[in-house]
Amino acid sequence: MRILVQRVTSARVIVGGDVVGAIEPETQGLLALVGVTHDDDHMKARRLAEKLWSLRILDDEKSASDIGAPILVVSQFTLYGNTTKGRRPTWNAAAPGPVAEPLVSDFAAALESLGATVQTGVFGADMQVELVNDGPVTVLLEL
């Protein structure tokens, strides 16, 4: 499981012209792009949620748990794209939807159980993600 985390001052996910999840402007939060591979499980999702919730990448070396920063979770199978051969990525390392969707949901639910305010994109949908990266700070978490 890979989580590409971006510190943001605002972000939103749009599906079919509708905003389905957002971090309001001028609110420091985290955008978590979540990729799932074949051997991931519920424990990895939980451990990564705990790691993200306590990761000190916000202002003044604070974590989301320290300041109650909102987290926007968006599924992102392309995090497992392989570009070593040719000019077209392959997605073989990405878990199929029936495997990945419940694990992305478990990740978001684990964050909520830790006390996070979580919004999400729509799994498998064509999404437009808008964000204002703060810093910029971008970190890759992986287990």
Curated annotation (Swiss-Prot):
Keyword RNA-binding: yes
Superkingdom classification of source: Bacteria
Short sequence motif Gly-cisPro motif, important for rejection of L-amino acids: positions: 135-136
Keywords, alphabetical: Cytoplasm, Hydrolase, RNA-binding, tRNA-binding
HAMAP family assigned: Deacylase_Dtd (MF_00518)
Family as reported in the entry's similarity comment: Belongs to the DTD family.
Subunit relationships: Homodimer.
Protein name: D-aminoacyl-tRNA deacylase
Organism: Mycolicibacterium gilvum (strain PYR-GCK)
